[in-house]
């Protein structure tokens, strides 16, 4: 019979729980389970026993009101379960006991600590049986006694023998039990035991008979007697040991030896099994051809050794553990396991083992070396390892979370996090226990709501399963004061006080019996549906029937409708007034109505009724008790109706008074309707004091449906009215200012709360009495008055103060508890660092497994992949181009013709390394960077506190704020003159949403208008280390000369759905040509996301901080961001004394948050830190409440912003089409890395993967006749960082780029537009009558843009010998320049693979421009290898050239080359000299143009022309010159027309806001244009024409106002320009105020440098034509040619002979230069020709020249110039 069956049968024979426990204790001892059961009955320490001795549990004497019978039944089940399942450990059993106590006795004083070794039975019972327990422990050590008692106990517990006959012999005895040898062995052992027992018995008898006695003189020594007696006792104990303990000890030793031997044998077998499996697994990894066979063998071995069964048993056991949810003990154990610190470590180790099988081999030393080597290249091993560890850990943590969900069945919070949360909750309770805070409960609804939430949070914490008993007890302690505060909230008037909605009063009269009461409920349902209460049974509990005869409003619980059926039936009398009359006065009012309730718990109830329904039989109400009857009728007359039956549905009847009236004819009702509402009609009644009946009909009767709609509409209007009134009152009580600063003063009180306390304490210690000290205070009246106030304010001891004291102690204890837990965790980890190391190793192996997996997946199976390069042909990888981070020296991975970048400097130009370069902490001086010794870092003082790292709650939001927003956010300033001094004021913040569209609060515009800021005042956009990068005048925002704030067409406000404007304005700055920005619109939330924005969130405010004159970024942390669905009124700053249109404005629906915002934060973007939200940006900060530290944000969604962009585009479809454009960084740019920029106004974009190199050696060489004909005046410019003669070290590239970032002027838009319109008329006029204009009004094909049209000299093919530009020059090439993509022969290549790739790049660029995406065009900044004047070279001045990529060149030519060709075919007459052949009659035409208005001319040159270009001009050039041309063959109202316009705008933007690269830095220019674009000279000419007209207008305004029109300019000035060179012919009428000197001075005012053509600085007002130079040529009339010719300066002619270039044959270039020199010198006359000829012939005769030059006669050269016969004349 099993022991479980014995227990089941013994259940009915046990009389008490104590007996059951005793029997169970015996059974547990017999089964050897004392550790599992007996210890649960035994008290941990004797002091606990004494404390519990006087107590009783509910199971014995103490009665707590629980179900005793059910409790005892559960306890029996519990004990049976424990005795049967001996595998339960103490913790599991304790959990069961805990669940029992929680279910049946949760209020017991020891309930919270039950299970920690306390008793399950009463302490009194345990004390009574303590001796028995001790004896039992001695008895149980004897085997015979144990066997005897086992049988006896089983018989006692078995009950009736007949009902339980015992076990049945169901099978025979095994043969081994009948072995005679076993019987003999057993008898021998028995005889041995008997012999030992007999010997011990005899020994005892001998000791007893022959006791040792003292003799002789020892008899008198008591000490000796004691020692002898002790010796006798020791002999007795030795016998006891031999008889009792020694056999047991011997048996235990034998058992231990046998067990150890068995375990050793089992271990050997297990090791052998594992070794066999490992060998098979290794073979499986090596022998790929025999994998199938090996798998079969492995499966057979596993089955042979029984591994398959063990695995299945483990899985089933795990499944049972997971699915076991019937007992709390199992759940709590799993929870503890999941949160055990070893869980993560074990999981990572398992993960590592799985990775081992995935790798299919044990990583060796070479594998790890190669693995680390590869990680080192991308970019370094440490960075790569960190990223992989982060990724693997993240996925592992996600897996752990899923395991927790599956195993535990719920999402569990971290215990540590929950403890911190409880700590904060307790502190909040302690905060509101203070008297000042507690008083706010009755005054502040927000405080009341917070206190109410504290109690609810406490209830939630009490339901949590918290293993720590101290924390659970702490929660229980804190719940009582939280409940007391909650009860105070319930009794607070703030829950119902304040203004209420004036109820809609409906007064229905009619004869009795027509069904007024029956009709009331359908009316209630219709009203409730209008209120939004649509539940079918809502009318039952939302309509309250009021009986006035009952004094109390019992049963009222905030119902919205109150019905007074048969009202005013009681007569009103002065002595006994009708309470209904006065209740009408109180109820129908906005003043709060405090209801009279009978129950105490219902006190403090206020009326919330919104509709009052009165039914009466007549309108005449007798009013005697009130002094002003009109007060009654004013409340009742608004909706007074007489209910009557329609004629066709009525029948005439007579009432008791003999009057006839229409009653309802029930026979005419609709049988299908339970209540037929169609029979009623409602006659509106109007109160008329002059009428006899006081009431007259008002209009025609209406049906029920119309009546119900009228009442619902009236309710809705009154509801909205009340809502607005309450909003106004709230706003009036707490005015929110538009984030203005305020001045505060600090006051100090001499007698603070500690002053008298300190004096009294000191006095008592000195022996003074209270009377004596009070007399001293009374000597001064002011001091005595303060003392009286101090006595009044002495806090009295209350229950709140007691709770405050207790809570302070509890909170302190909890803080200590949390610190101890942290210290224990830290200590555990620090003492066991190998756990962390094992976890890290697991992650590393996992990372290596992932790497191996992808390597196997992505490589060809037919070729064995190697981790590192071994040089073996069989294992060599497929040849492919490898990109290195640094040079490795490997032939296979070395980049062609590129200097690699090393971690350290090796001095090797090829950067070939034999070993991996190591990065040192300190410098060792070794070129190989090998460390000679470890560098030690000393710490002077040990840190006293431990620094803890804190992770970011939302890395995506953090990256968004730091990387994206910071490049789109600007701080705004403006300047104005104050008392003769220009002062700078901070306005606030603006954010660019995309491209040129920025967003800012609308009240900025109002502020500028109210402060009367002049339209010409500039608004400066600044960022840290980039001041005033964008400058925009106020006139761009506010229309000038407007009587109120009126936005320009470049601005629009964002609206709500109902067209209500928000405090947010969008501004398009494309007309001001500021640089474009990235598109961040996708980061704003959508409308669909707003449903998830419930509750409270955390976030940040991206703003700026001004420290002295330095601007830095600031990120304001926002607490408790929550939606606020109500209007707020925002007031302008009180300190701002300017005149606003109104003192405040309203913002509907906003986000509210707790943050100490300040002036200047307005306009900052609010971002959420929430991983569950894909999009993070929710709004823009607009106002703040400084006193309450609250801020508010205007909500923004993608839909709302897109609606605003569409509105903006419709305002000006041409100029605002750019609102859809945006900038995106190039594809190979790391925009998250901060790149460097040259000094000046540039915008950093990031770092490039491609590092651009620079030429370091010039190709210019001194010719063989250098300095022999003339003294050299030029030399090659510097191409590298150079030390100048004055000792200064100069980087010529940085010095040249600095000129492009200078500050530029902001000009009046009207002036710029006037100049642009005049230039448009000039350049678009067709002067060449032989020209077919339709030939140019088109776009080119791809082929035409590449190879040219073939029919126009100004639309030739692209020069293919020049650089292909960014990204292309890094590609392997066989031919120089662009020839790999465009071909090298006469025909251009369009079919090769490279040609097709280029075509795809061009098409992709065009598609991006069509979508408004500015992307993937980078100009490379390089130094120009040329000769410059010696003084400029010595000053370190080298010109910078910016080369464009070839795909952009093709695309730009496709859309703009025809327009450029048209301008060049109409050259000179359109003021543009581009395309001029200086040897032809073109020079004569230029001369005639410069003599049109007389002989006074000027020739000028701009200093730093490219750097001073104003971006504002570029927009006008494109808009006023190219756009009209574009419209002649494109309809912008069609889709194709809009697409083409967007393409042209995109390509133009790539020029005027070009992206540049030097080194690996990528940045954007804010103005100017790159010199390497196809339109450079044309753009400069247009700019030149515009700037001279602007100077004319500015000078005329000051000196000749009547001459400032463009008509006067054309009448008095004619000009010609080529790039930045120009010449002007000026009439005598204006030359005194418009000349070389005045123009130069005016140019300085608009930040341009304009000097004479030679840049000498010696300027005259108006030189003659023969004195000036244009394009380094003069204007000379040739009598031989009879026209004006262009002789080149003589020093330039002779200088070209001093130099040649480093080509295959430099002398060939010299001979070409000699030929060109003779053709140029002839224009200077025959004498100069003879001088040069004699010098050249002399050098030839001396053999200095490499060959004899071919020299023509003077007349022959003139003839060639006349006929343009030589190729030198062919332009």
Swiss-Prot record:
Outcome reported for the amino acid change (mutating residue 114 to A/D/G/N/P/R): Reduced host AGO2 binding, loss of AGO2 inhibition and loss of RNA silencing inhibition. Loss of replication efficiency
| Chain ranges passing through the membrane | none
Extract the coiled-coil ranges from the record. 1-29, 1385-1413
Read off the domain note.
Answer: The BC-box mediates viral E3 ligase assembly in order to degrade host AGO2.
The record's subcellular location field reads:
Host cytoplasm, Host perinuclear region
InterPro entries reported for this sequence: DNA/RNA_pol_sf (IPR043502), Helic/Pol/Pept_Calicivir-typ (IPR004004), Helicase_SF3_ssDNA/RNA_vir (IPR000605), Helicase_SF3_ssRNA_vir (IPR014759), PCV_3C_PRO (IPR044067), Pept_C3G_Picornavir (IPR024387), Peptidase_S1_PA (IPR009003), Peptidase_S1_PA_chymotrypsin (IPR043504)
Location of the Peptidase C3 domain:
954-1201
Q: What is this protein called?
A: Replicase polyprotein
What organism, scientifically named, is this protein from? Cricket paralysis virus (isolate Teleogryllus commodus/Australia/CrPVVIC/1968)
Q: Example GO molecular function term?
A: cysteine-type endopeptidase activity
User: Could you confirm whether the keyword Cell membrane appears in this record?
Assistant: no
Q: Which UniProt keywords apply?
A: ATP-binding, Coiled coil, Helicase, Host cytoplasm, Host-virus interaction, Hydrolase, Inhibition of host innate immune response by virus, Nucleotide-binding, Nucleotidyltransferase, Protease, RNA-binding, RNA-directed RNA polymerase, Suppressor of RNA silencing, Thiol protease, Transferase, Viral immunoevasion, Viral RNA replication
Report whether Nucleotide-binding shows up as a keyword of the record: yes
Against Pfam families, the record matches this protein to: Peptidase_C3G, RdRP_1, RNA_helicase
Q: Where is this site: Involved in the inhibition of host stress granules formation?
A: 146
Question: What range(s) does the SF3 helicase domain occupy?
Answer: 482-656
Record region (Interaction with and inhibition of host AGO2): 106-114
